[in-house]
Structure formats: structure tokens, C-alpha cells
């Protein structure tokens, strides 16, 4: 007894690990037999103790924790607050998810802690408490689920379901909770069965790969090894684990003393000696080389020494042991366990790992604010991040506490703030532990309501890919979805409400006008054009919202020749979709109302080219002879033209039937105008017809240019050689285009006359540009009638106007009728004009035009003509001699050349000298002498004037102009943004004389020799300023505000930047030219009070502000202008009011201030277009809804409801600015990092992916690079045979080690210990194959064949020729199907295919593995059956020495190959270094 009393008595609980340690100590001390006896006694003791106390377990024993109710309530309150923050746009979706997970996780954890103390205090003998907390059965987490709350679940993908299960199993779950609980990954019903099957299948494949690996001999004689050294950042524990049970590949010396010999197995004693040696001399210690299954030289088995000790006892593994199957089972079995273990919440949060710093007492906190900078926490709350260790002092009443906060921590309080005791003041970032995988996850945010997307200026306007609609966010900003209620209507509906009226929900929204009744039409087909008919004057914003791809420049167009002022017409600017304008691109056009055909009907356009020589002549020299050029010239030209037309312009022959057109363009009226059943005559007094913008005829918007233009580009101008003046092609030319009309339907031909559709950007060459200075329109009618229709008139008869032609067709013109019958239809042409039968008809020139005031000698006419006439010679009924002449009235249109840009644009528009010019080009729409068909009684446009962007030829740099659309306050604004890439221009500054009307601000530049849009003289590259300048219009009738979005380093509004001294301004002459003050604004014309919308073309430097002036009398205008108030909003959102009226002289377009002081600055609380979040306290009452300020009045403002979404940097925005989105459309895609749980939801699939050699994440790129370098360098150094061998070996060695490490990482993170050598055996099989490459043809293997690396080496040595091959990584499935035994392959998968292939190849199975023998019923070659298979040959003993002799130069090579120790990436646990002969 005395002895026992002296023994140490351990009174503490013992758990599994303690038990393990105890047993291993016992084995070391007493050996196996005695230990088993001791353990038996322990078991008996345990049983005895367990049965003496009887434990029952009933449902009453599950006691719910009393504090659960208020804890859950508290968490719900926090979630509600979070939801509100999200709604206000204060946190974004990812932060919301993270925080909600953490709130519930914390609640759940707190409950778990409460549970323990609750049991201990209230019922210490509770059986549940006794069982679980003694560690006998169950664990705290399970009991927590029974009596606490189940908490958060992961879905099968390992993502969090952010709806927590609040009930526990004692209370029972609600239906939703039950489904989540099944779905969640904690022993989920859904998922366990599948996972178990997966784990089982993994085990089966692993065993299949390595079933034939048996320990067959003692030593394979290899002299390779893998180096292990604790210097490579290995923990001591890992180092010990790696070494114990291995065999040394080389002697180990400390100093000159050898402490361990080659082929000695390493026990715990030896390892301890290594460690002490390393500690004593950490730098001088050499790495230890050990043998592993990787280094074994045998092909299909393994030797004792390379395998090392058996896992079951501390001695070398026995011969005949089936180590392959043991390895497969050891790896697969934890997988099965892993699937079924409960694991925690899928690891979305890392909240558990962050340590909190709490305040030691109440007091005032102070720290150095220069050492921190503001940031957002993971939950979107403001915090400070400290770069370096920070000392924080807390001043309480009597004591000064100092708290040290480590670097990279977040400080959650402000400087000088009062903190309470135990308040969290900082959060320490947890050191990133290696066990946490980080993964990047995408999260999509979807719109919660219909609306219009709006983003701040922080979004790049150019999308990421040229034609995509994805944009990256450069910094954190809000996206707003402005609420929209859609009124879908094919045309602009006539609205009962004016702009900015408030509407009741059930108010009458708008009365739609039927499609065919109104004469105002919006052209559809992707471009909205703006037309201002009279009824829309007050609410033109209806139209404004619809314009998508085009904007209109209002032009002030005075035509002095005409008596009355033609009202302005808009230039339509084509905005290529996301496009950039290139040189010589048409970027705008307008249809001059003077060149418009009346509604009277179809006809022919005739014109001629002016050749270049003629341009130098004056018009006065045009003599009469030039009119009468010879007929054969026309003929040749016509032939040329016909061939041209037939061969090339097949497009023209498109038959457009009614239906196809409808499908393509909506309704045909939308494109061509609409039916109008009156004909207007063409008289001089119908000027208003031309000037009226409502009667526009547009052909399809995508077409640029005309046929003529194209033909000139591609084939040279057909009329290049001719000098002919007025005249046409040969007389019957319009009847030659026979088969253009195929449609049998009456009146439904919609033929695109003389237009080629050209979808791309039209560029034209300057080479062949000809000019036409006059063209003529000859009326002529064409009816295409179905074959069946009965005609009421005869061919060649003469009819009057409105004669009935068929049952329901009447003629629009009077004149000669020609009828042609075709296969499918009948063509009926009516030529207007008089018919004459002259005597000498053959002498008359066919098809010539006669100017007014002259008479044709051959014709009997002697009347004076007002207009030009067109004489055509026709044959009578095929007879050769008889001709008659038809004299047809024409309308002549002069092309006026004098009009250039100066009259169209104010001088300061688009004038960026030396860089950009805009040329004016007129296009004639119709082909010469082609019939223009009247379509649905519309008027057609003959000439379209195009503006062409043109850069100076000499400039080498590319310049690009693109159009940006920005929308604010419900107005679309498109800006022409001209980016001059890499053109650095220097600026000079010149002081002006003071005499020129007051002082000029300092920043005025000399416009003669520099570009005119910089406020400071400096050398600067223009490519920095790629921002648009815009205007923000207020539709309030009294004043409008202008907002300039300019690059911050570009010029702001002149004086904002330069005048830092307000006194300096007062000394100036009060008449300051407004042009200078406005800087980039340029001239301003104010909006007319009753007309509310205006459009501006804005360049990078100038803004043109012009209006449609619908006011006839200018006095009224003048009065209106005097009442205007102006205010400017600059980029910093300051509003500047000019406190004076501005006198505007609309003729001179220059503005002056008429007041003593230039401006006053008022800092407004709100401004137009500003976005306001809900509950912002601007006024006494809170704002009830988030939205955009829509209009500001004296005492109130209107908000358009909007919903903000916060988006972080790097998020991708889907959709375009101003796009209408519907509920559920994707708005933003976040990319965020979350720590990935390495548990089985992701762990097992990950292990499987590695074994199957599918890439899970890219290899460390430096590893790939190093291997490539090696593969390049080594052949150079060593010559080819060595090079390939070593290159392939290196690749294989590297990949093997990194694979082992990856697999170990997953298992260790789960707390599962698997010995490296099991994994090594499997990886060895997966990586031991090489593929023969085609470089060198060898006689042994065919290219592409998979062979073992060792076999390839041996074959190469035997044949003395180099075999070219590259290393390949097979998955376990493919490795199982690429073994030496076809029987084992066939019993695994694809039986028929494998057997058929084996039969064709005549494969032999040597029955070396276990499976083949099992299948065929033989004795398996392991254990006792092993002896029969192995006959020891006497040479085995001498093998080692022979190898020594062979490898004479091993030592020299070894030094050189030592270099690649560093080749292994630093994260690998084991580094390898092998050397080879």
C-alpha cells in the first residue's frame, strides 16, 4: 500500500487522444502482450461502472433554456435593422448576408454556452447532461440542437441558407424549418445517401488503381531519395510524422560523424537526435534523404525498404503484404466517415475567428488619427484600419489605460469618443490560417421592381467588351432603380397630363391615339426621331423619353433668299450602338425640307455629275451647245449602268410584301409615314409644305449614302468621263428594270427605290466624289396589278386625272398609258405631259431636258415654259419609223453649294482646330433615271445632307469620337465625345488688351495658335479627359440650371477655378463677357417660356445651347428672355445664382451680365437630380421614401421614387444607363471572397477532383514556369536523351509532391490523419505514365501510346536510342483502365470495349495482381500465396553493387542536379530532391 500511495494519481477526464497516448506509452514500455492485458482490465472496469448506475432518457429530460426567447427576439431585431439598412442602400447584399449569418451564429453559440451552465445549475444529474458532457455519448452540438436551436444550415453546395432554424428538436420544427433541415447538410435526408455512395465509389476506384501493388522484394536498389528538412517551414509535428517509419536513402553525418546509415529505418529515437541536431545548428544541418514509394524502381510492385515500416507494428513491412489495398482503404474510409459527420455552418462567416478588443473601463478613448484611415468593415459599418501597431489610451476618472492594437486591425470607435466598460473598441484580423480555403463566389442581385436604371458618374460608360452590356465599377457607388410605370403604346400616346403633374394611381393615364389617325409619326426601328407637331408643344417630353439612339441638334437656319423664315429642322445624329466614329464617317444628317417631293405621286429623278474640271469654270460659261450632247454617249453610259445595276445591286430586287415589312418594322406606317388621302399640287406657294417638320419622309435609318455613292466608291463613277450637262439616259431606260416587282398583290408594293441597305458604318472615299448641282423630278405613275385584274383602259391610250384603271384603282396623273404584261403581274405606267407628233421625229434627241425660256427647234411648241421640261422620244407600236415625242413637266431643284457649315452651326461648335473638321456632303437618294415609287402617299426626300467627321490627313494619331448617353432628370442627353488619343498639345497664354470691352479673365487663351478649351496653359495629353460634358435641364418654366460633368482636371466654369480672391472680381468692369465666364459653356440662348425641352450637342470643350424658336414675333421673345433666371451647378454640387437678369440679344448670341457683382454662391441642401435616401433628415420632417429630386419649387420639391442598391468596386453592372428593367432582371454581379469550409460538402469532392486529376485551382504559376524552364534548359545542358528523362522525371516529381500536399491539406483540415505513404502509393500510380510524343519516331512504341516511365527509360537504354515522351497525369478512373492487366480493367468498367481491344491487340495478362486472380479463381499472390509466385534468383544479392558500377558518373551529376531543391513551391510540406544516373 505504501508503494501505491507514492504513485502519482491523475484525477482528470481522459478522452480519445489521451487514450491513444496512454496506449502508445504502454506499448513502448511493456510491449504488445502486456498492454492488451491492461486494456482488458480497463474495459471490464468501464462496463462495471456503467452498469452500476442506471441511466434512462425521456423527453422530460430535455430542458429548454429559459433565455432562448429573448435571445432570438434580439437577433430578429438586429436582422430587421439590417434589412432596413439594405433598403436604404447603406449596405450591399453580400454584407447583409454576412452579417445576418453572424448574428444568428452568435445567437446560436451563446445559447450553446448558456445550455451548459443552465444544466449545471438547474439539474446537474440530468442524464442528457451526464451523457454528453462526460463525453460518453453525443456532443455539445447535438444536445444544443435538442434543447437550444438548430441554427443556420448550409445547402448541399456549402452555401449558407440565411434563414435560421429557430426551433429545437424538442419543440419541433415548422414545415419550412423541416424542409431546410432536410436540405441542409447536417445529416440531411436529401444528401447523406448520395454522399455515402460517393464515398464508397471513391474507395472502389482507389482500390482498383492500386490493387496489384504488393511488397515483393527487399530492395530495388534505388539511389534516389526525397529530401526532408525542417527549414522549409515544416512544423516539428509534421517533420516527425513524415520521418517515422521511413527508410534512409543516404548516410547522415553530423560534422564528420555518421549517425545513421543508408537503408536504416527511422524510429522515434533517431528522429529526436535529428531534431536536437537541427536545433543546435539550424543552418549547417543537411537535409535528410528518405526513400518513399515514389522512388521505388520496380514497375508493378514495391520493395520493403521504399515502403518502410508497417503501419500496424514497428518493424519493416513483411514481404507479400498487399499494401496497395491497404492504402486505398485508408484513404477511402475517412471519406465515408467525413460524409456523415456533422460539421458547422459551411464557413460563410469568419466571424468566429476575429478576436475582439474590449475597453477596460468607462472613459474617453484617444488615438493618433494620422495612423489610421477610414474603411468599411465586412458588414458595411464604418471603421478605421490601422497600418501599424497602435497605442490607444482610455482616460477614465482616475486611471489612464493603454491598450495596444496590432496592425491591420479595425478600430470601431472614433477618436475622443466616450466608451463604456467592456465595449468592443477594435477587432483584430485573424491571421489567415492555412486550413481555410478562400474561394471567389459570384452573387447576383436581382431587381425588386420595374424601373429605369440610373447610376452615378462612377460607372465607366464604355462597357467591358465592345458589344456587351457589362460594366465594371471603379469604386463603390449606388445604383438606382427609378420607379417607372410602363404605358406601352406603339406611338406616342396623347397624354392628358403635362410634364410633372402628379397622378393618382387610378387616374386616367392617357388616351391612346389609334395608329392610323394622326399625321405625326415617330419612326421606329431602333431609332427614335423627334418630331414637333403642334399638339406636342407642351408635353414633348413624351417623345423625349423615347429617343434611344439618336439626338437632335436644333439648327437656326436663316435663308435670306426666301422671303419667309423656314423654321428650324433638326439634324439627326446617328449614334452607332456603343459605337465610335471613325474618320470619314457620316455622323449626322438632316433632310433639307426644300428637297422634298410633294405628295402627288411617284416619278423619276434626273441629275448629272459635275466633273472636276467643270468646277473651275463659272456657271456663266455654260453654253447652249453643252446641252445637246450626242446620243451615243448616253447609250454607252446606259449600258455601263445597266450591267452595273444587274450585277451588283441584287439587293434592290428585294420584293417587299406587306407582311414581311410588318414583321421587320412594326407597321409600315411607322416607317413610311401614314396614309393621307389628299394630293397636294406642287406650286410655288406651297413653301410651308417644305418647311413643315411634320411631313418628313425617312427611309430606313441605317442606310447611309445612296447608290451613286456606293457605285463611285467601288467601281469608279460611271459618268466620270462624260462632260454631258443636262440630259438623261436613253429614252426607255425606266422600262428596262423589268423584274423588280414580283408581288401579285395590288397596291402593296413597298420597293426601296434606289437605296442600298448598308448596315455597317459607311465610309466613303474622297477620290470619286462628284457633285451634282441640279436635279429634276418628273412625275410618273406606276401601278403593279395582279395578273387577273381586268383593265378598264387600253395600252398607249391617253387618259385624264382620276380615270378608273381597274375595279378599285384610279389614276393619280393624266397622260399616256403604257401596259406591260409579265408572268406574274401587269405593269401599268402613266406618263404625264403632252404628246406631240413632229414631222422629223428621228432627229429629235431622246430624253433631254430643256431649260425654261428656250424652245426646242424640232418641236412645234413655241410657248414659253415656266419650268423645265423633259422631252422623251417613244416609238409607236414597234414600227421603226414612227416616233412621237412626249413633253413632260418637271420640277427642278437647285443644289445650293454656298451653304456650308458656317451657316448651319455657330462658329464655336466642334471647332477643335487641327484636329476635327466636319464636312458637309449632299446625297441624292435616288438613282439617276430610276423610278421613285410613291409609297402610301408620303412625300419622299430627295437629298439628304450628311455631316462627315473628317480629321486632318497629316495627323498620324488615331482620333475617335464616340457618343455617350447620360440621363438625368428624366431627360436623355447624348454627348459627342471626341477623344484625341495621345496628341499632346502645348498651350500658350496671351494677355489681351483691356480695351476690348472689359477685362478678360486670365485663363483666356490665344485662339489663333492653340486649342480653345483649357483653362490653364499647360501641356497635357487630351486622352485623360474622356468625360462628357452635359447639361441638366430643369423643366420649370422660369429658369433652367446647367450642370457640367467635366473631368476634374479639365476646365471647370472659368472663374470657379481661378478667382480665389473675391475682391479681385469687384474691381473689374461689370460687363464681363459671359462667354469667358462660362468657360466651356459657350454661347447661350435661353429657352422660350412655353416650349419646354431642348437638346444640345456637346463636344469636349464647347456647348451649343440653342432652341427651336417657334415664336414668330421677336418682341415677345425679347420680353421672355428678360425674365429668365440662371443658375449654374458645378461638379461639387454648389449652386451659383447670378443675381442679375441677363440681357440676351438673340441675333448676336452674346450675353452680358448687367449687375455689379458677378454671382453669389449658395450652398443648397438639395439640388435638382440629386438622389436622396429614405429617412435622411434634411428638413423638420423626415423624407419618407428614397428617390431622385425631380423638380424644385420655391416651397416644395417632388421626388421620383427610386430604390438604391449599393455596389462595391469590381462589381459588374448589367444593362445600359437609362435602360428599363423589369422585376427580377439581373442588376449587379458581386464577386466576393468567402472562406470555404473544407468539410465534406466541399472536401470530399475536392479530394476526388485531385485524384481524378481535374484541376480545382490553377497550379501555382511559378511552379509551371519553373518546370517549363527546366524542360528547356536541361536538354541543352545534357543533350537529348538525358534531357527528356530528367525533364519528364522532374515534372512527375513536382506534380507528385504538390498532389500529396493538397490531399493531406483537405484531410488534415478535417482532423483526419492519414499517413503520407498511403497517398504516395496512389499518386505514384496516377503519375507513373508518360505519353510517347511524335517528335522522334521510335520502333518500339507508337506515338500517343501511354507507357510507364520506368518502362520507357529501360526501353531507351536497351535500344540505345532516344525515345521522346512527355509526362501525363491520369485520373484514378483512367489509371484503372490503363493497367497491365486487361482482366482487372474489364472487371472495373467498359467491359466489352476493354475485352475487344485486348483481343485485337493480342494482349497477355500475366495475372500479377489480386483482382485478376480473384476473377479467375486462382490463388491471390499475397500473404501465404506469395511464396508460390516469387522464386528468389541468386543474382538479387549482387544487384546493388552492379548498379554502383554502372553509375560511375553519378557523383558529378548529382552536384548539378542539387540546384532544383529550390524548385519546389514553398507551400509544399515535403520537398523533394532526387538524383539519378
UniProtKB/Swiss-Prot annotation:
Q: What is its EC number?
A: 2.7.7.6
- Catalytically driven reaction(s): RNA(n) + a ribonucleoside 5'-triphosphate = RNA(n+1) + diphosphate
Q: Which UniProt keywords apply?
A: Chloroplast, DNA-directed RNA polymerase, Metal-binding, Nucleotidyltransferase, Plastid, Transcription, Transferase, Zinc
- Which EC class does it fall in? transferase
Q: Where is this region: Disordered?
A: 617-754
Spell out the Basic and acidic residues composition-biased ranges.
629-638
Complex and partners: In plastids the minimal PEP RNA polymerase catalytic core is composed of four subunits: alpha, beta, beta', and beta''. When a (nuclear-encoded) sigma factor is associated with the core the holoenzyme is formed, which can initiate transcription.
Official protein name in the record: DNA-directed RNA polymerase subunit beta''
